[in-house]
């Protein structure tokens, strides 16, 4: 049986931390920022940890 390939789109969007959690960037932070207040845009530029519901699925996609 051949090796599993990692999902290239998922590899570009998600990174694994040293503790094994999955880090992701927030959406809605790249354009149309004049409509959003400063607090919101500042928060949108920070990365966050993926919640547990999708973590197992994304790990399988990244590690292949």
Curated annotation (Swiss-Prot):
Signal peptide: none
InterPro entries according to UniProt: Ribosomal_bL35, Ribosomal_bL35-like, Ribosomal_bL35_CS, Ribosomal_bL35_sf
Cellular component, GO annotation: cytosolic large ribosomal subunit
Keywords tagged on the record: Ribonucleoprotein, Ribosomal protein
BP GO annotations: translation
Pfam families recorded: Ribosomal_L35p
A single GO molecular function term of this UniProt record: structural constituent of ribosome
Family under the similarity heading: Belongs to the bacterial ribosomal protein bL35 family.
PANTHER family linked to this entry: 54S RIBOSOMAL PROTEIN BL35M, LARGE RIBOSOMAL SUBUNIT PROTEIN BL35M
Protein name as annotated: Large ribosomal subunit protein bL35
Organism: Chlorobium limicola (strain DSM 245 / NBRC 103803 / 6330)
